[in-house]
Protein backbone atom coordinates (compact mmCIF):
# COMPACT_ATOMS: atom_id res chain seq x y z
CA UNK A 1 0.00 0.00 0.00
CA UNK A 2 1.39 3.41 -1.01
CA UNK A 3 2.34 5.31 2.18
CA UNK A 4 1.49 8.71 0.72
CA UNK A 5 -1.93 7.45 -0.27
CA UNK A 6 -2.58 6.33 3.32
CA UNK A 7 -1.43 9.72 4.66
CA UNK A 8 -3.85 11.40 2.25
CA UNK A 9 -6.71 9.33 3.66
CA UNK A 10 -5.84 10.24 7.27
CA UNK A 11 -5.71 13.95 6.40
CA UNK A 12 -9.00 13.49 4.61
CA UNK A 13 -10.71 12.11 7.72
CA UNK A 14 -9.62 15.19 9.67
CA UNK A 15 -10.86 17.43 6.86
CA UNK A 16 -14.29 15.79 6.88
CA UNK A 17 -14.84 16.63 10.55
CA UNK A 18 -14.09 20.33 10.03
CA UNK A 19 -15.90 20.69 6.72
CA UNK A 20 -19.10 18.98 7.87
CA UNK A 21 -19.15 21.12 11.00
CA UNK A 22 -18.58 24.37 9.09
CA UNK A 23 -21.80 24.07 7.07
CA UNK A 24 -23.88 23.72 10.23
CA UNK A 25 -22.73 27.17 11.36
CA UNK A 26 -24.84 30.26 10.57
CA UNK A 27 -22.37 32.84 11.93
CA UNK A 28 -20.10 33.89 9.05
CA UNK A 29 -16.93 34.56 11.09
CA UNK A 30 -17.18 31.22 12.92
CA UNK A 31 -17.86 29.47 9.62
CA UNK A 32 -14.71 30.95 8.08
CA UNK A 33 -12.55 29.96 11.06
CA UNK A 34 -13.69 26.34 11.03
CA UNK A 35 -13.55 25.94 7.25
CA UNK A 36 -10.07 27.52 7.08
CA UNK A 37 -8.75 24.78 9.38
CA UNK A 38 -10.47 22.20 7.22
CA UNK A 39 -8.94 23.75 4.09
CA UNK A 40 -5.45 23.40 5.56
CA UNK A 41 -5.86 19.65 6.01
CA UNK A 42 -7.56 19.46 2.60
CA UNK A 43 -4.46 21.03 1.05
CA UNK A 44 -2.28 18.46 2.81
CA UNK A 45 -4.40 15.65 1.42
CA UNK A 46 -3.91 16.82 -2.17
CA UNK A 47 -0.15 17.15 -1.64
CA UNK A 48 -0.04 13.57 -0.37
CA UNK A 49 -2.18 12.41 -3.30
CA UNK A 50 0.23 14.18 -5.63
CA UNK A 51 3.14 12.15 -4.23
CA UNK A 52 1.04 8.99 -4.52
CA UNK A 53 -0.48 9.36 -7.99
CA UNK A 54 1.35 12.12 -9.88
CA UNK A 55 1.77 15.74 -8.85
CA UNK A 56 0.77 17.23 -12.20
CA UNK A 57 -2.82 15.98 -11.93
CA UNK A 58 -3.15 17.35 -8.38
CA UNK A 59 -1.40 20.70 -8.87
CA UNK A 60 -4.50 22.77 -9.56
CA UNK A 61 -6.18 21.22 -6.50
CA UNK A 62 -3.18 22.04 -4.28
CA UNK A 63 -3.26 25.62 -5.56
CA UNK A 64 -7.02 25.81 -4.94
CA UNK A 65 -6.73 24.43 -1.40
CA UNK A 66 -3.84 26.74 -0.47
CA UNK A 67 -5.75 29.70 -1.88
CA UNK A 68 -8.83 28.55 0.04
CA UNK A 69 -6.96 28.41 3.35
CA UNK A 70 -5.56 31.93 3.00
CA UNK A 71 -8.86 33.36 1.74
CA UNK A 72 -10.87 31.83 4.57
CA UNK A 73 -8.50 33.14 7.24
CA UNK A 74 -8.67 36.68 5.85
CA UNK A 75 -12.47 36.55 5.52
CA UNK A 76 -12.65 35.25 9.09
CA UNK A 77 -10.90 38.39 10.33
CA UNK A 78 -13.01 40.65 8.11
CA UNK A 79 -16.38 39.18 9.14
CA UNK A 80 -15.35 39.05 12.80
CA UNK A 81 -14.98 42.86 12.78
CA UNK A 82 -18.15 43.44 10.68
CA UNK A 83 -17.67 47.20 10.25
CA UNK A 84 -18.20 49.35 7.12
CA UNK A 85 -14.41 49.59 6.78
CA UNK A 86 -13.94 45.84 7.08
CA UNK A 87 -16.72 45.22 4.54
CA UNK A 88 -15.04 47.55 2.06
CA UNK A 89 -11.74 45.78 2.70
CA UNK A 90 -13.52 42.47 2.22
CA UNK A 91 -14.91 43.53 -1.16
CA UNK A 92 -11.48 44.69 -2.34
CA UNK A 93 -9.93 41.46 -1.08
CA UNK A 94 -12.62 39.47 -2.90
CA UNK A 95 -11.77 41.20 -6.19
CA UNK A 96 -8.08 40.49 -5.67
CA UNK A 97 -8.85 36.85 -4.86
CA UNK A 98 -10.93 36.50 -8.02
CA UNK A 99 -8.01 37.87 -10.04
CA UNK A 100 -5.54 35.54 -8.34
CA UNK A 101 -7.87 32.58 -8.86
CA UNK A 102 -8.19 33.35 -12.57
CA UNK A 103 -4.43 33.58 -13.08
CA UNK A 104 -3.65 30.51 -10.96
CA UNK A 105 -6.50 28.56 -12.51
CA UNK A 106 -5.43 29.29 -16.08
CA UNK A 107 -1.80 28.39 -15.30
CA UNK A 108 -2.87 25.13 -13.66
CA UNK A 109 -5.11 24.27 -16.61
CA UNK A 110 -2.33 24.93 -19.10
CA UNK A 111 0.07 22.75 -17.10
CA UNK A 112 -2.43 19.91 -16.64
CA UNK A 113 -2.35 16.93 -19.02
CA UNK A 114 -4.42 17.62 -22.14
CA UNK A 115 -6.80 14.78 -21.27
CA UNK A 116 -8.01 16.49 -18.09
CA UNK A 117 -7.96 20.19 -19.00
CA UNK A 118 -11.72 20.29 -19.54
CA UNK A 119 -12.25 19.03 -16.00
CA UNK A 120 -9.89 21.57 -14.46
CA UNK A 121 -11.62 24.32 -16.44
CA UNK A 122 -14.95 23.34 -14.90
CA UNK A 123 -13.21 23.26 -11.53
CA UNK A 124 -11.97 26.83 -11.95
CA UNK A 125 -15.45 28.08 -12.87
CA UNK A 126 -17.02 26.29 -9.89
CA UNK A 127 -14.29 27.57 -7.57
CA UNK A 128 -14.85 31.18 -8.64
CA UNK A 129 -18.59 30.79 -8.06
CA UNK A 130 -17.90 29.42 -4.59
CA UNK A 131 -15.56 32.30 -3.69
CA UNK A 132 -18.27 34.81 -4.60
CA UNK A 133 -20.90 32.73 -2.81
CA UNK A 134 -18.83 32.72 0.37
CA UNK A 135 -18.65 36.50 0.44
CA UNK A 136 -22.32 37.18 -0.35
CA UNK A 137 -24.55 37.79 2.69
CA UNK A 138 -26.76 35.19 4.30
CA UNK A 139 -26.43 31.43 4.58
CA UNK A 140 -27.76 30.26 1.20
CA UNK A 141 -25.33 31.45 -1.48
CA UNK A 142 -22.35 29.69 0.09
CA UNK A 143 -24.27 26.43 0.44
CA UNK A 144 -25.57 26.48 -3.13
CA UNK A 145 -22.16 27.22 -4.63
CA UNK A 146 -20.25 24.76 -2.42
CA UNK A 147 -22.58 22.00 -3.62
CA UNK A 148 -21.71 22.76 -7.25
CA UNK A 149 -18.00 23.02 -6.40
CA UNK A 150 -18.07 19.74 -4.47
CA UNK A 151 -19.65 17.88 -7.39
CA UNK A 152 -16.85 19.03 -9.72
CA UNK A 153 -14.10 18.20 -7.21
CA UNK A 154 -15.57 14.69 -6.84
CA UNK A 155 -14.92 14.16 -10.55
CA UNK A 156 -11.27 15.20 -10.10
CA UNK A 157 -10.78 12.38 -7.59
CA UNK A 158 -11.85 9.64 -10.02
CA UNK A 159 -10.05 7.96 -12.95
CA UNK A 160 -11.16 10.94 -15.06
CA UNK A 161 -8.30 12.88 -13.45
CA UNK A 162 -5.98 10.40 -11.69
CA UNK A 163 -3.93 9.23 -14.66
CA UNK A 164 -0.85 7.78 -12.98
CA UNK A 165 0.02 5.52 -10.09
CA UNK A 166 -1.57 2.40 -8.67
CA UNK A 167 -4.64 4.11 -7.23
CA UNK A 168 -7.38 5.13 -9.61
CA UNK A 169 -9.80 6.57 -7.05
CA UNK A 170 -9.15 8.92 -4.14
CA UNK A 171 -11.96 7.62 -1.95
CA UNK A 172 -11.27 10.09 0.84
CA UNK A 173 -11.26 13.05 -1.53
CA UNK A 174 -14.69 11.96 -2.71
CA UNK A 175 -15.87 11.43 0.88
CA UNK A 176 -14.89 14.99 1.82
CA UNK A 177 -16.99 16.48 -0.94
CA UNK A 178 -19.89 14.17 -0.14
CA UNK A 179 -19.59 15.32 3.49
CA UNK A 180 -19.98 18.94 2.36
CA UNK A 181 -23.05 18.10 0.30
CA UNK A 182 -24.47 16.00 3.15
CA UNK A 183 -23.84 18.81 5.61
CA UNK A 184 -25.78 21.22 3.39
CA UNK A 185 -28.68 18.75 3.24
CA UNK A 186 -28.60 18.28 7.03
CA UNK A 187 -28.51 22.05 7.52
CA UNK A 188 -31.69 22.56 5.52
CA UNK A 189 -33.40 19.62 7.22
CA UNK A 190 -32.56 21.12 10.61
CA UNK A 191 -34.05 24.48 9.72
CA UNK A 192 -36.86 23.31 7.42
CA UNK A 193 -39.48 24.36 9.96
CA UNK A 194 -37.94 27.80 10.49
CA UNK A 195 -38.00 29.45 7.03
CA UNK A 196 -38.93 32.86 8.46
CA UNK A 197 -36.02 32.97 10.87
CA UNK A 198 -34.08 36.17 10.14
CA UNK A 199 -30.73 34.47 9.57
CA UNK A 200 -32.33 32.05 7.09
CA UNK A 201 -33.79 34.71 4.79
CA UNK A 202 -32.35 34.83 1.28
CA UNK A 203 -30.29 38.02 1.63
CA UNK A 204 -29.82 40.41 -1.27
CA UNK A 205 -26.22 40.71 -2.51
Locate predicted features.
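Alpha-helical membrane-protein topology signature
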Residues: 1-205
Amino acid sequence: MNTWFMIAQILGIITIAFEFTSYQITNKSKYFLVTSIGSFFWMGMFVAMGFATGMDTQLSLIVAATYSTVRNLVFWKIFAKNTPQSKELGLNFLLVMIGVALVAGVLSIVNAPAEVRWLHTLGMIAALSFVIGQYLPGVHYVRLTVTLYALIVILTQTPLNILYGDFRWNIMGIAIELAKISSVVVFYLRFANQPKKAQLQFARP
